[in-house]
Amino acid sequence: MRRWSCLAALPYLLSPAYAAGLGPSSGEPVAPAVSERASSYSHWLEERSMLQQARVLARHYSGNSIQWQHPYGQPQPHAAVARASVWFTAYPASTIAASPGTSVISTLAEERLWSAFQAIGIQGIHTGPMKRSGGVRDLGYTPSIDGNFDRISFEIDPAFGTEAQYKAMVAAARSHGAIVIGDVIPGHTGKGPDFRLAERAYADYPGLYHMVQIEPRDWGLLPPVPAGHDAVNLTPAAVDALQKKGYIVGQLHSGIFYEPGVKDTDWSATDVVRGADGVQRRWVYLHYFKQGQPTLNWLDPSFAAERLVIGDAVHELAVLGDGMLRLDANGLLGIERDPTGRVWWAGHPLSLTANQLIADMVRKLDGFTFEELALPLDVMREMSRGGPDLSYDFVTRPAYDHALLTGDAGFLRLVFQLMREYGIDPGRLIHALQNHDELTMGISHFAVHADETFPFRGGRLTGKELRELVRREMYDRLLGERAPYNLKFGEGVASTTATVVAATLGIRDLGALKPGDVERIRRLHLLLAFYNAMQPGVFALSGWDLVGALTLPAASVRERLADGDTRWINRGAYDLLGSNPQASQSAGGLPRAVALYGSLTEQLQSSDSFASRLARLIRARAQLHLQSARLADVPAVQAKGLFVLVHELPDNTGLEITAINFGDRAIDESVPIRGAATGSKAIDVLEPQAPPLDLGPDGRLQLRLNAFAAKALRIKDPVSP
């Protein structure tokens, strides 16, 4: 450990000598005078920093009665779902503008688009991050390195449009009874003005980040920074050496975005930076994700991170007009070396506290939040007690894809049983098809509960064994010669929903698809939409889903894949309305993806299209008020491909049965339906003209499903109208 104790040094830290920049932690002693140019640059950075923008914004709300108009201390999942229960999740960089010169935001504000959304039943648009991102070098901005998930300003990214256009989009959504859903990224920023000021030890900016100043005598532990770069990733040996010196907590047991030679650890070192006080320093900083995404420090005496993130949330709600916010990567807000010596970073209690603060502030201003991070069920349960209102369904997402790929819904049934044991309400989950990320198969609950045993396929497996089995079966079917159009990424697969389905069907060559193949893909795609829509909570789908996008050829985005981020193949550009057929790429430079289903304009003219069938499904969901239902049972079944959910509809209006055959063979099975009265009849919600089914005296329902088919059945009490 370092010999210099911070407590013993406290009197020295408060001394004039230290304040002048001459202390042992200040680097090389220099004259205290700071050049006018350096001071001017610091002020230039500060004016553009998010922390400064948060300070200015806070003045308008501190002491204002607006803070006391809404309840905020507890999550309000049902109120959040009532505000918008069907979402379109946009990805700005993939959006093809309506016409040359039209911005992405103006494209998303078009009346024709919102008319199409309303026809489908979409009630909210999650824009994805739209604020300026990337970094700052000297007086210029550098581009985003992670799809605008490296935010550096509260300003709208000029590549997407303007603040005025954003507000017009909000107005367009509201005129169609919908909301706009924005983003806050509480775990990290890009290398913008805030980080550059932190490097320069300016004011309280170093308190923003999990960054540690390294004594000049220990600079030998740090590798040199390559020419043209501003930081260098540390080797495991360097991390261990710094940990032994007492600088950092050390290596994390598993890394995100691990790529040999690119990201060997979650720690990087800056080059020598001359500070605002003229002192030269080198820093080591934490970044769970890419090197250009330094991690915020949520427990620093300056409380700078809290001020920045909450200021960003206030800006989204009060200035831009968003009705809900995503908290991205919100489970990585605390880190320490625990008493056993283990580095504790996932599911840290500080994350719970931080999420509570953000979610409370958002609810204070009449907004709602949702989290988007794959968490174990026990952590989700703790988070639901005081944090975000909704959670992204990373729990059943890999499970339902596993069911489709294998024709065996056993793992999906097990996951639902565990959710019930942990008290996870599906009504507070966002059940989604594709999003901008890979199909994640981290299956985190079983990784954390690696030694616990679970029933599966007639035996018992440890969490580790079960996780490995499920992942192996999915990888075998989604990658390699069987499906060369998908690529591995991290603990998942870069794919679109359409290419997951294609792999399920054994289609290897996407360039040789015939009309019959497209129809089969569309049919199974709708089956997955049915699974997600016919549950309580939020149903979300993307632009790639709406047009039936295929993955991009890797060669077409080769430069973007250079750092190992293969997700760019599942982010191809799409033109929702077909307004700009000549465009070969989006404004963000992504090539146009092959769209199997065509534009929404084309699809809504055909009753048999994906969008039109989807609209009928969403209408049925709305008529049942299924978004507000309660999961009552997950019946045991015999056929391995059969999956059944029993929901209690709100206001005592009966039961709804969601029945899906994930297998390639027809099913005819009698299933027990708890809570159904003798003599009740089951009506097919999507085909009401079909003869109703009778429940037997033993409360069992005979389900007949073709291969890859589903039914939604409503059961009313015999005396109900």
State where each predicted segment sits.
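Acidic/aromatic-lined carbohydrate-recognition and catalytic surfaces
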Residues: G23-E306, H315, L332-T406, L412, ...
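Solvent-exposed beta-hairpin/edge-strand motifs
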Residues: I673-Q689
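An active-site-proximal structural segment forming one wall of the substrate-binding cleft
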Residues: A304-M324
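Bacterial N-terminal signal peptides
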Residues: S5-P16
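Boundary at the C-terminal end of the N-terminal hydrophobic targeting segment
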Residues: A17-G21
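C-terminal beta-strand-rich structural cap/linker in extracellular carbohydrate-active enzymes
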Residues: L695-P721
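Surface-exposed beta-strand/loop patches in extracellular or lumenal glycoproteins
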Residues: F662-T678
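Loop/helix patches that line or flank the sugar-binding groove of alpha-linked glycan CAZymes
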Residues: G423, L429-E656, F662-A666
